[in-house]
Structure formats: C-alpha cells, structure tokens
C-alpha cells in the first residue's frame, strides 16, 4: 500500500496489525522486501529513475543508540545497508516525529514507515484531501481514495470527489508509465563483446 498525494508517497512495512505485534513482526527480511517493492514501484509506476527512499525508525529518537530499543541497530540499519549495497537509494532510520514535522519528507521520492499509524497519521494530516491509496506490485492497477469508504459521511452531502478524481488520474498515469517502462525494457540490444 502506498498512500500518495502529488510527490508525497508513504509506504508501510507492516499493515493492519495490532500495535502489540509490530516489533515482533518487523524483520530485516521484511524491510528489505518492502524496500524492493517500493523502489520498483517508484521506478516502473511513477517513472522515477533513481528513487530516494527515507526509512522511518520504529522507536522514538531512532532508538537513541539502543537506549529506547534495539530494532534500529539490529534490524533496520542492517536492512538499509544491505539494500543500499544492492543499489537502492535508501536513507535513515529517521525519527518519525521530527522527520515529518520538519518537512524533510519533501526531499525524498518516498517514505517507508514501519507501521500503519506512523505513516498514515502524518500523511492524512498533511495530505488528506486528494490523497490516493495505491497498491503496488499487482498485475492490475488498483487505486482508491485515501479516506477509504467513508461510510460515516455517505449520503450526507459531505464527501468531496477530489480523492476519487485523483485516484482515477493516478491510475491513468501509472498505466502510461508502465507502458513506457515495458517499451523501454523490450528487446534490449545484445551485448556485442
């Protein structure tokens, strides 16, 4: 899942799970998998040649060198080093509060949050109107308004069509970008040496 509005894109390591299970769910391998998916989607679906991805920490103050948790040192940083060695431009881990609050997210093509509310709370605070939920790595293109079904306002004349309209536009853009990507990688020239 990638939540996006314009150039602000947030993806998640974990999905809809209880907060009590977040730390035990996050592994080096899971972070590497999500970074690879996010990176590929930014390239193929959003036509970003060399995406820069910021990765948020799990613990406050990025664990404060192990004082507030060891996940950064034992899991997140090793995953970032591995993926960086594979050519993915990933940086962090950044403390979520200061990173989002200072606007540092604007210097990156995407932000990988460790869990649902860590990524979605600031996204919805900063970009709710017109936000789009995009599902990466599917053979079909799937978008929806970032606000979800919004049953609480259904039939009350309160809903804005902006997120729905943006979801359609994103789907069209992704379709075109995928066509270009497919054409660019079709029939590559053979090496002549």
What are the residue ranges of the model-derived segments?
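Anion-binding alpha/beta catalytic cores of soluble intermediary-metabolism enzymes, centered on
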Residues: 1-71, 77-193
């Amino acid at each position: 899942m990638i939540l996006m509005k314009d150039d602000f894109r947030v993806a998640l390591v974990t999905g809809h799970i209880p907060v009590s299970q977040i730390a035990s769910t996050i592994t080096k391998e899971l972070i590497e998998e999500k970074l690879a998916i996010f990176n590929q989607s930014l390239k193929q679906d959003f036509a970003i040649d060399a995406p820069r991805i910021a990765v948020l920490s799990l613990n406050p103050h990025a664990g404060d060198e192990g004082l507030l948790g060891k996940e950064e040192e034992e899991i997140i940083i090793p995953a970032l080093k591995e993926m960086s060695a594979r050519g993915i431009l990933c940086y962090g881990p950044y403390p979520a509060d200061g990173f989002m609050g200072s606007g540092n997210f604007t210097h990156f093509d995407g932000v990988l949050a460790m869990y649902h509310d860590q990524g979605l709370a600031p996204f919805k605070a900063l970009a709710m109107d017109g936000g789009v939920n995009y599902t990466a790595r599917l053979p079909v293109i799937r978008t929806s308004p970032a606000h979800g079904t919004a049953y609480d306002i259904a039939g009350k004349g309160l809903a804005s069509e902006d997120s729905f309209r943006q979801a359609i536009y994103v789907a069209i853009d992704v379709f075109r970008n995928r066509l270009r990507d497919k054409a660019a990688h079709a029939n590559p020239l053979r090496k002549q040496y």
